[in-house]
């Protein structure tokens, strides 16, 4: 949540407007939560990030993982809303699917047997971490602007 908060406050202060910031990441249980907040900087490209993560997971049987999304709305220095959402799953042994980006080809959603990259956008939006975070944001926005 801290990164979303930092981003939202910085943009709101710079623009003088309300700001919504997102910070998302993939946490892998066997790797102590890595790549976590460093998900986008874990390697230099999506392909290299996937290869690195799969290589680091080779010695582990535990492939549990979770995508998390933190959303923050700020006005100047004031944080107005903070919510988060997540989606649990497993890291596959090899990439599957053509849709999405980032770690989507190796993140298999718990109970569904398919990766984010095998899903269409609408399905991913409904069950994914960002979609879940925005589901929590909606009622908070209604309260804020009531």
Enumerate the language-model features and the residues they cover.
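Anionic-ligand binding patches
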Residues: 1-146
